[in-house]
Amino acid sequence: MGKFKPIIIMKRILLAICMMAMSALSYGQSNRVSFTFAWLSDVHLNSFAYAEDDLRQSIEDINANPAVDFTILSGDVTEFGDTKEFLLLQEILKNFRKPYLLLPGNHDVNWSENGCTMFNKIFQASHFCYDWQGVRFIGCGAGPSLRMGPPHIPREEILWLDSIVRATPKELPVIFVNHFPLNRDLSNWYEVTDILKTRNVLVTLAGHLHTNRAYDAEGIPAVIGRSSLRREDPIGGYNLVTVNEDSITFCERIIQTETRPAWNVVRLNATAIASSNIPGEKKDTVYYRPDFSINSTYPAVREVWKQKDVTDVASQGSIDGELYIYTNTAGMVHALNARNGETVWTYATGNKIFSAPFITSQLVVVTSCDGFIHALDKKQGSARWKFNTDYPIVACPTVANGNVYTCLLYTSPSPRDRSL
């Protein structure tokens, strides 16, 4: 049956809203029935020798269980996020005889030699929105892209999440999925919780910590799930999640061995938590937010202007006189007036940009994950020439003695450098 076809990309938001409105009407006409889904996380394909076996055996175990309707994989599905790993993952996931929903985690994007382009290319999108038996499942991607830094949800994923949540009826039950737990370890956790708290979120699911744990995400019931890796155990495992009218139950499944008693129950539409022998949600009372009061300590430093982009800005900008040029992960090159921040010109490449532009007396040279080196007119932003390297470029360009230099990293046996 394969993967659910998710609602993807900003260009399709209007279609997504129409589809969700139809689904909401269906929800209003029928009561929710109980269902069960399998929840895998932190597969880390290509990490340990047994990681592939654990995933394949998990899929076999799920296929053989008639109670399971579909599967969620909540990130870190590979170890390094390179192209070979994603192609192997694609081949393994074809063994599912039931639908699955898939998200990237930090391991899938932090060290990507393909410039974080292959996950979307192979699996269609880094987020999903799907309705099942009167419950809406919403999941968004993780980051930071191409940076080994603190957990972060990319700006474009936040905007996508906000648009989907706004189009979701307030009474419609929602289960939210991300690779990261929604706490202060996530740099922009509060952006997510502020969005989710506007809707009827039953529970949030996360991986990342390789353990089963219940916690509270600013009043929203939240659960962290185990890794599918066996580690010191003889065989791997995952969670079986059953959604009922009045509760959501979490049971650990040991592959082809046993389903253990419920380790967590989220009570729905009730103030009481689970029974004393089953950990329930803890209720925090103080919700923290970033504190920028230090800015007032140094009055000599003041903000002249600022712009907020619709995607992440992953590299430093470049400045030449009164021209400031920066790039973003939507593949855009923006030239601004350095004095007031007003747009001078923009130029679109075909994929993400993680590199800083190089400015010469006449040109702005940019490398992009579309595989091209772009040389733009510095004054007008029009293309003067471009060169195809046939592979995503994440390295910054430099110009010396009339030559452009950059570097390419291939996972094939023949990496190459080129100077132009």
Sequence positions of predicted segments:
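Extended active-site neighborhood of metal-dependent phosphoesterases/phosphodiesterases
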Residues: T83-D162, R166-K170, E191-V203, R213-G225, ...
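Short loop/turn segments that connect beta-strands within beta-propeller blades
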Residues: N337-N340, D377-Q380
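Beta-strand-rich domains and repeat architectures in extracellular enzymes and scaffolds
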Residues: W305-A330
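N-terminal active-site segment of His-dependent metallophosphoesterases
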Residues: L25-L88
